[in-house]
Swiss-Prot record:
Subcellular localization(s) per the UniProt record: Mitochondrion membrane
Encoding gene, per UniProt annotation: ATP5MK
Example of a GO biological process term: proton motive force-driven ATP synthesis
Function in brief: Subunit k, of the mitochondrial membrane ATP synthase complex (F(1)F(0) ATP synthase or Complex V) that produces ATP from ADP in the presence of a proton gradient across the membrane which is generated by electron transport complexes of the respiratory chain. ATP synthase complex consist of a soluble F(1) head domain - the catalytic core - and a membrane F(1) domain - the membrane proton channel. These two domains are linked by a central stalk rotating inside the F(1) region and a stationary peripheral stalk.
Pfam families per record: ATP_synth_reg
Descriptive protein name: ATP synthase F(0) complex subunit k, mitochondrial
Organism from which the protein derives: Homo sapiens
Length: 58
């Protein structure tokens, strides 16, 4: 058999239905969740407030 397996072949329930390594949709959701979490971490560190030092060195 050439090509991806059909989604009807696997009967997943719960979170495994959306995040698995057997179906194309499951793999896509894993990739999107990974990229999304990396983007959120980058945005958090870019946008967090920069604290000014208590004593400025002159």
């Amino acid at each position: 058999m050439a090509g991806p397996e059909s989604d009807a072949q696997y009967q997943f329930t719960g979170i495994k239905k959306y995040f698995n390594s057997y179906t194309l949709t499951g793999r896509m959701n894993c990739v999107l969740a990974t990229y999304g979490s990396i983007a959120l971490i980058v945005l958090y560190f870019k946008l967090r407030s920069k604290k000014t030092p208590a004593v400025k060195a002159t």
